[in-house]
Amino acid sequence: MAMGLRWGLPADLEKVNEFLHKTEPITAFLGYRLVELSEGRACAVFDALSNAQRVGGILHGGAIMTALDETMGFAALTLNDGDDQVTLELKVNFLEPGVKPPFKVCGQVVRRGGRVVVVEGEVRDADGRVIAKALGTWYYLRRRVEG
């Protein structure tokens, strides 16, 4: 996941969300929208329950992982200098069923090295219960993305 453009902080979240929905349509499908973007941190909300539920009316784990990947990737991106980046690893623990939207997902950089950054994330439901925790690693490719 990469923005493909150089934007500064604070970012115009409306423009970032518009760009994201155009270039990564799954975010629009999930009702995903960034609400916070600061150095080493990103938060978003999404209400995917009607589009991405499994039997029993529970939010699908793949939707949770997608929201974590996007948000944690944005947290890593805030420390990037405009180069492309990729997810190397993403480990998710599902702690509670996701049944109460809207869901809030946040990612926070834990450590940044030269080309590798470690990010932690979590998803909460409308009642503030943590439904998933994650730890991931992103790799900066050192190549510019046109966009």
Swiss-Prot record:
Query: Which is one GO molecular function term here?
Result: fatty acyl-CoA hydrolase activity
Keyword entries, A-Z: Hydrolase
Instruction: Name the domain of life.
Output: Archaea
Q: Which cysteines are joined by disulfide bonds?
A: none
State the InterPro entries in the record.
Answer: ACOT13 (IPR039298), HotDog_dom_sf (IPR029069), PAAI_dom (IPR003736), Thioestr_dom (IPR006683)
EC annotation from Swiss-Prot or TrEMBL: 3.1.2.-
Q: What class of enzyme is it?
A: hydrolase
Q: Which NCBIfam families match?
A: unchar_dom_1
Q: Which PANTHER family match?
A: ACYL-COENZYME A THIOESTERASE 13 (PTHR21660:SF1), THIOESTERASE SUPERFAMILY MEMBER-RELATED (PTHR21660)
Q: Which family does it belong to?
A: Belongs to the thioesterase PaaI family.
Q: What is this protein called?
A: Putative esterase PAE1329
